């Protein structure tokens, strides 16, 4: 699998802290602004970037991310442009892992082999495709692994001991634990339940386990990061973009900086998480 992802988690383990994994929607609200956001994320403390692929029917996403996708699509964002976004980012940053996250339909239309080849060229390290279960691994997961691209699988509170081995079988990079049932942007989960779930997953895999859904503040990141290898934040970032826009959805001079300020705060949470847990 890609060395960039493995190296990043090894570095974080040596530092004794969890990763801050930040999600944003490619092309929201426009290409240039989203590239500015992407470049600002590592500088603000993001360790891994999740690059959202806008899609017209995002069934697992809450209202904030749905609206972000609509803004991106309205602005002309396509899967090809989202790959180009990663390629442009790689011109100045070859260290930060990039995971593309979204749905299978745009990839299928683009063409699986062409997509994987273009993703490799663009410097993509992993994929999260939320509507492809393990039973459909031959569609994209196995071809991605053969190309050397991590395929990151989701585990949920309803993933029981019988189901978990199938979920983990072809997973690489890290495991994304969805901390509650429902859509993105839900309330903060019970930290004790999250800790127990992470430990249960770790009994079956040596992969890092990152926790997402419901993390919005530095304190949330600190609490969840105390028991996980990574904390995923998406809705809070997408909301920060939205609140910085004009009434007609255009970027302002403050858009990129508003996101960077939020991420710096979240980073302070993850950077203190393991230190607190170790006391």
Swiss-Prot record:
One Gene Ontology cellular component term attached to this UniProt record is:
cytosol
Pfam families, alphabetically? Trp_syntA
State the EC number(s).
Answer: 4.2.1.20
Catalytic residue list = 50, 61
> Which reaction is the catalytic activity of this chain?
(1S,2R)-1-C-(indol-3-yl)glycerol 3-phosphate + L-serine = D-glyceraldehyde 3-phosphate + L-tryptophan + H2O
Molecular function (GO) terms for this protein are: tryptophan synthase activity
Record-linked CDD domains? Tryptophan_synthase_alpha (cd04724)
- Tell me which SUPFAM superfamilies the record gives: Ribulose-phoshate binding barrel (SSF51366)
EC main group: lyase
Q: In which pathway does it act?
A: Amino-acid biosynthesis; L-tryptophan biosynthesis; L-tryptophan from chorismate: step 5/5
Alphabetized InterPro entries for the sequence = Aldolase_TIM (IPR013785), RibuloseP-bd_barrel (IPR011060), Trp_synthase_alpha_AS (IPR018204), Trp_synthase_suA (IPR002028)
PROSITE patterns named among the record's database cross-references:
TRP_SYNTHASE_ALPHA (PS00167)
Lyase as a keyword of this entry, yes or no, is yes
Q: Which UniProt keywords apply?
A: Amino-acid biosynthesis, Aromatic amino acid biosynthesis, Lyase, Tryptophan biosynthesis
Q: Which PANTHER family match?
A: TRYPTOPHAN SYNTHASE ALPHA CHAIN, CHLOROPLASTIC, TRYPTOPHAN SYNTHASE, ALPHA CHAIN
Q: Which HAMAP family match?
A: Trp_synth_alpha (MF_00131)
Q: How does it assemble?
A: Tetramer of two alpha and two beta chains.
Known function: The alpha subunit is responsible for the aldol cleavage of indoleglycerol phosphate to indole and glyceraldehyde 3-phosphate.
Give the family this protein belongs to, as stated in its UniProt record. Belongs to the TrpA family.
The protein's name in its UniProt record: Tryptophan synthase alpha chain
Species in which this protein is naturally found: Rhizobium etli (strain CIAT 652)
């Amino acid at each position: 699998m890609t060395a960039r992802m493995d190296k990043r988690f090894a570095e974080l383990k040596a530092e004794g802290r969890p990763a801050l994994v930040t999600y944003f929607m490619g092309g929201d609200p426009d290409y240039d602004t989203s590239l500015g956001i992407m470049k600002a994320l590592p500088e603000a403390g993001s360790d891994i970037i999740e690059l959202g692929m806008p899609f017209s029917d995002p069934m697992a996403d809450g209202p904030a991310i749905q609206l972000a996708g609509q803004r991106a699509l309205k602005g002309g964002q396509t899967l090809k442009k989202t790959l180009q976004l990663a390629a442009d980012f790689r011109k100045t940053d070859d260290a930060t892992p990039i995971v593309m996250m979204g749905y299978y339909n745009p990839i299928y239309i683009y063409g699986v082999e062409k997509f994987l080849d273009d993703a490799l060229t663009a410097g993509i390290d992993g994929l999260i495709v939320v509507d492809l279960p393990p039973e459909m691994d031959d569609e994209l997961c196995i071809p991605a692994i053969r190309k050397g691209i991590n395929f990151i699988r989701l585990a949920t509170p309803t993933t029981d001991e019988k189901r978990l081995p199938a979920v983990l079988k072809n997973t690489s990079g890290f495991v994304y634990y969805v901390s509650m049932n429902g859509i993105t942007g839900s309330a903060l989960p019970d930290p004790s339940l999250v800790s127990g779930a992470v430990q249960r997953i770790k009994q079956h895999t040596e992969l890092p386990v990152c926790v997402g859904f419901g993390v919005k503040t530095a304190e949330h990141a600190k609490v969840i990061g105390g028991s996980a290898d990574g904390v995923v934040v998406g809705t809070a970032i997408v909301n920060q973009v939205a609140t910085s826009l004009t009434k007609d959805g255009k970027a302002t001079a403050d858009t990129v900086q508003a996101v960077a300020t939020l991420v710096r705060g979240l980073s302070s949470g993850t950077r203190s998480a393991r230190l607190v847990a170790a006391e």
